[in-house]
Amino acid sequence: MTQRRPSGTTLAVALLALVFALFFLFPFAGLVWRAMDDPRAREALGDPAVGTALRLSLVTTAVSVTLSLLFGTPVAYLLARCRIPGGAVLDALLDLPIVLPPTVAGVALLTAFGRRGLLGEPIEALTGFSLPFTALAVIVAQTFVAAPLYVRAARAGFEAVDPELEAIARTLGASRAHVFRRITVPLARGPLLAGAVLCWARALGELGATLIFAGNLAGRTQTLPLAVVAAFEGGPLGLPGAVALSLVLLAVALVLLMTLRIVAKRGLA
């Protein structure tokens, strides 16, 4: 049996795919090469500022993802199972942080929770606490831009669960909470876990909203992406530091992507 030779169209498509893949590969390869080639970049990896920014990123993203799961899960289930007044408006509001530029999200948060904001001014008058430019502001910004990704994935997971299974369990005497915990969540675990990983990845890479709402204060609000900007713009670490910080972010992103793939495979199994 003779093998068919690839057609001209197939070769052209393969060439375009190769060029497209190299377009994404070379920037990351260049980053790794620069980090390995420049001893200053390797030295910057041991700088205390890098560890501080990494710790702040991990702590704030852990809190923001927890908040996203805590509040986003019931919202996603509500949107998947119920027709509520204003549901379309809520649905659109959840899409806005995804499609808006992060800087616009930061300005919106500032006008709402800033010292002269819609809610920020009365809160400060009552409590004396100002939210902007604090670590809590970092968490708020991350949650604002990342939580909708989790809600979208969770909603899709809940919609894929057959409502008849929940109804049968209810007729057998199970409470709504028991049905949700023992039937709905396990059946939707794949999308729920994938959404949580996506939420974490988005929160980890958040820059614009955090910069405007929380600032870029070393040791207080400076997460890894903000530390990259500070180093690139002439900070103490300089360009080698920006390369080193970018490499750390790249490594964390790869771990997240591998986790997402594993979760997706287990969810489909």
Range-by-range predicted roles:
Residues 22, 55, 59-71, 75, ...:
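Hydrophobic alpha-helical transmembrane segments of multipass integral membrane proteins
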Residues 2-3, 39, 87, 106-143, ...:
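Membrane-interfacial helix termini and adjacent extracytoplasmic/periplasmic loops
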Residues 2-13, 23-27, 86, 152-166, ...:
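C-terminal transmembrane helix and the adjacent membrane-cytosol boundary/short C-terminal tail
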Residues 27, 191-230:
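Non-cytoplasmic
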Residues 4-10, 41-42, 48, 211-255, ...:
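Interhelical loop and adjacent transmembrane-helix boundary motif
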Residues 15-16, 21, 66, 96, ...:
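Transmembrane alpha-helices
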Residues 4, 43, 63-94, 107, ...:
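Transmembrane-helix boundary motif in ABC transporter permease subunits
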Residues 2-11, 29-66, 78-87, 230-240:
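Periplasmic/extracellular loop-to-transmembrane helix junction in inner-membrane transport proteins
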